[in-house]
Design a protein with these regions (language model features):
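P-loop/Walker A NTP-binding module and the surrounding RecA-like catalytic core of P-loop NTPases
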Residues: 3-169
Length: 169
């Protein structure tokens, strides 16, 4: 399956993919470090083989295995100048991840990405990114988000809930 990653500039699309690339036994190098100004200016592709998927998702899947050859992630640029590349990535995908900075919320290219995905009839999930910037958030590098959330105080979770539901309207 092909997974497109779309969203506004600087909302962390390439960083999320770099994190995925760094997991598992077949670690790959960081793409963001090689991007001019840290901004994606072309469509990039990352393959995540089934064995890495199974390794990454084991804590969430309870030992179940993916019956898939793996995933091909397409990283699309978020800058307003690259609408055509976002549209191309969104229309190629079987599913998409719409990345939104939880502190910034929906921005122009976020809304444009939603329109692209709707027009292409590409199903998508929303990934709230930069959650670690919420005041009081206790980061646990390498932890699954669901586990990290259980470790937060009620005040921090109230702030998370407020920001999360603001994004969803």
């Amino acid at each position: 399956p092909i997974v497109a990653v779309l969203g506004h500039v600087d909302h962390g699309k390439t960083s999320i993919l770099d994190h995925i690339r760094s997991l598992g036994s077949e670690r790959q190098s960081s793409v963001m470090d090689r991007e001019a100004g840290g901004i994606t200016q072309h469509i990039g592709a990352t393959e995540v083989p089934a064995d890495i998927l199974n390794e990454m998702c084991a804590p969430l899947m309870g030992g179940k295995k993916f019956d898939s050859p793996g995933l091909l992630f397409i990283d699309t640029p978020g800058h307003h100048s690259f609408t055509t590349l976002r549209a191309r990535g969104g229309s190629l995908a079987d599913i998409a991840i719409l990345v939104i900075d939880i502190m910034d919320g929906c921005k122009p290219q976020t809304l444009e990405s939603m329109r692209i995905l709707r027009q292409a009839k590409t199903p998508f999930v929303i990934a709230c990114n930069k959650v670690d910037r919420l005041y009081g958030w206790q980061s646990e590098p390498g932890r699954v988000m669901a586990v990290s959330m259980r470790k937060q105080t009620s005040d921090v979770m109230a702030l998370f809930d407020q920001r999360y539901w603001q994004l969803l309207g």
